[in-house]
């Protein structure tokens, strides 16, 4: 991991762009989080400028030809790029429990929800699916006790409240289909250049 800091105008963005271009050139896929919205230019060749010509002469570069790089844009909200999503099922109970900051008892209930979904060949795609599952578990708690343990109403209600918190933070945009995978971020183009994946996080 590289940490680049400095005052405004010291070249932080340019440093990041140069590194991304270098990695892409040698076939290494790159993932960038675009905080300010100024990295999209990697996809386009730079416009001619006297300062660029002056720099090329100074460092001995001949026949400089600017070019764009293979870029894929991602956006959690799907406005400025492909929507970046996953499903509740793919996230799994352990990571979801951590996200929701559940205690051990509540985490156990969440594991039971995933187990019930697996046993019944049900997919938990988004937060609505998980809410429906928890509601069903609360209604059928007595019938399921022998197989899945004590599904207490208080713990189920606590999980529902934690879901409300993450929904207020717009987390529902992150869950759903089509689900992105790590392979989507590890691609090269037909020329062997690493694809630069740029995630727009200006609204996060």
Model-derived features: positions:
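Walker A (P-loop) phosphate-binding loop of P-loop NTPases
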Residues: 9
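Conserved lysine of the Walker
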Residues: 12
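P-loop NTPase motor domains
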Residues: 20-29, 37-204
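Hydrophobic positions on the alpha1 helix immediately C-terminal to the Walker A/P-loop
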Residues: 15, 19
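Short, small-residue-biased leader/transition segments that mark boundaries at the very start
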Residues: 1-2
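The Walker A (P-loop) glycine that initiates the GxxxxGKT/S ATP-binding motif of P-loop NTPases
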Residues: 6
């Amino acid at each position: 991991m590289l940490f680049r800091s400095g005052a405004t105008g010291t070249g932080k963005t340019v440093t990041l762009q140069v590194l991304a271009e270098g990695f892409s050139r040698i076939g290494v896929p790159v993932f960038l989080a675009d905080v300010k919205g100024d990295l999209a230019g990697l996809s386009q060749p730079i416009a001619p400028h006297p300062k660029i010509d002056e720099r090329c002469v100074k460092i001995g570069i001949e026949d400089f030809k600017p070019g764009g790089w293979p870029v894929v844009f991602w956006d959690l909200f799907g406005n400025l790029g492909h929507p970046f999503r996953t499903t509740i099922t793919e996230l799994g109970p352990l990571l979801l429990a951590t996200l929701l900051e559940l205690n051990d008892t509540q985490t156990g209930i969440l594991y039971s929800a995933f187990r019930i979904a697996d046993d019944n060949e049900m997919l938990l795609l988004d937060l609505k699916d998980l809410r429906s599952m928890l509601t069903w578990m609360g209604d059928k708690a007595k019938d399921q006790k022998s197989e899945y343990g004590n599904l207490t109403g208080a713990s189920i209600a606590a999980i529902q409240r934690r879901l409300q918190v993450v929904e207020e933070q717009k987390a529902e945009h992150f869950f759903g289909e089509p689900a992105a995978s790590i392979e989507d971020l590890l691609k090269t183009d037909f020329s062997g250049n690493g694809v630069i994946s740029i995630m727009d996080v200006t609204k996060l």
